């Protein structure tokens, strides 16, 4: 019997072995897939809905489409990346689990989990939402007249205690755990979750789980670090969008100098990967960012990077900048950045820039400016003091736009 899993370029292993639970408790195929109205929410008290999702109609349909080379709308982000020559999450899943021959069947219990336990966070990043950041939720509530259109509060818990127990009851079936937030290093649920793996002897030795944690590097939580230092297979995905004032503006209220020192400390103990979005706020400053990456790699240890074009919220995507500004910087980067450098080889930076170059769309900057000025207003900031090249591009709209008191 031929192995159908190798017969097409649509197939992805994620629906057969991976479980993603988002900030709202809703499952998706993976963290980059588009949502589908048929997906289930795992925040109900009854844990039976876990099996409703994993063995249910929706995932059965997706798996059959994968095996029959039928594209899925949810998977368009990966198709787009691959069409431009980039490395997609689909590629990553195939490489990570290539040793497992599924023979067209899902695993009894997913061996690869991606869980967001809560929205507890200590940052209020410009591109984030209050469903992901508790700090942003507070800021919007305290400045509702100015920020009300950026409200998308989700009050339900991400996961019920029963579903949490269901996962821990299958702890020996799990090979990969990814934890994101919010900020995992300050979440008590994450501490309990990691301790369960230690108590079950899944943290080290031949049976050690692969632990992947996304962190903003803002603080070195002693208790959290003691926990992750007990795991033998740890990868930290560190979130940066730029250096210096660019970082401080986008990822408020962080201080880049502190982030850098925390990152250097992590590099001494763990494998780290830098994750960054390319967006309207940081496009003019990528060359400085790349030069800093070179500096870190040459002086403190290997830090591979992964870039993705920001598409949500749409008002912060690169297409909100003028076409002339975009083309100026994209052309300069394509000509001057050494994309063959080890830390950029699989970064998707070149393919992302080529996609920007190919798509000459230009939209009104009104929504971009409104979001920018609204948060500037409540934070007592001005974009010109942080991102002068971006301000110059939007100056006319920004200067004339009124803000509610």
Residue ranges of each PLM-predicted region?
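Membrane-interface junctions of multi-pass transporters
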Residues: 5, 34-80
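Core AdoMet radical
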Residues: 110-120, 131-159, 172-188, 200-222, ...
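Eukaryote-biased activation of long, low-complexity terminal tails and linkers
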Residues: 147-162, 175-177, 193-199, 204, ...
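Local cysteine-cluster metal-coordination motifs and their immediate loop/turn environment
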Residues: 28-32, 71-83, 120-130
């Amino acid at each position: 019997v031929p192995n159908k899993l190798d017969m097409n370029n649509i197939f992805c292993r994620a629906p057969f072995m991976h479980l993603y639970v988002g900030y709202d408790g809703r499952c998706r195929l993976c963290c980059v897939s588009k949502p589908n109205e048929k997906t289930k929410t795992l925040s109900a008290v009854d844990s039976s809905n876990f099996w409703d999702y994993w063995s249910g109609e929706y995932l059965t349909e997706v798996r059959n489409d994968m095996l029959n080379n039928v594209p899925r709308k949810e998977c368009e982000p990966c198709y787009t990346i691959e069409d431009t020559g980039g490395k997609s999450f689909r590629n990553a899943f195939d490489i990570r689990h290539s040793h497992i021959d599924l023979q067209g069947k899902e695993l009894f219990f997913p061996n690869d989990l991606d869980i967001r336990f809560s929205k507890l966070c200590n940052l209020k990043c410009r591109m984030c939402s209050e469903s992901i950041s508790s700090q942003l939720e507070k800021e919007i509530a305290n400045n509702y007249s100015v920020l009300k259109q950026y409200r998308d509060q989700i009050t339900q818990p991400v996961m019920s205690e029963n579903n949490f127990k269901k996962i821990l009851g299958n702890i020996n079936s799990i090979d990969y755990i990814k934890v994101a937030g919010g900020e995992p290093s300050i979440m008590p649920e994450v501490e309990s979750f990691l301790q369960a793996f230690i108590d079950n002897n899944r943290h080290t030795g031949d049976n050690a789980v692969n632990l992947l944690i996304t962190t903003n590097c803002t603080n070195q939580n002693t208790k959290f670090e003691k926990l992750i230092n007990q795991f033998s297979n740890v990868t930290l995905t560190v979130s940066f969008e730029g250096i210096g004032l660019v970082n401080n503006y986008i990822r408020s209220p962080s201080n880049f100098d502190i982030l850098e020192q925390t990152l250097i400390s992590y590099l001494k103990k763990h494998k780290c990967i830098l994750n960054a979005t390319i967006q309207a706020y940081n496009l003019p400053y990528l060359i400085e960012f790349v030069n800093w990456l070179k500096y870190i790699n040459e002086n403190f240890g290997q830090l591979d990077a992964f870039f993705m074009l920001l598409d949500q919220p749409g008002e912060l995507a690169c297409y909100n900048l003028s076409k002339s500004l975009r083309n100026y910087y994209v052309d300069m980067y394509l000509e001057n950045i050494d994309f063959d450098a080890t830390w950029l080889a699989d970064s998707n930076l070149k393919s992302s820039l080529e996609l920007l170059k190919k798509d000459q769309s230009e939209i009104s900057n009104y929504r971009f400016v409104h979001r920018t000025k609204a948060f500037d207003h409540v934070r007592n900031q001005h974009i010109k003091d942080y991102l002068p090249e971006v301000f110059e591009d939007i100056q006319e709209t920004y200067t004339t736009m009124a803000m509610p008191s």
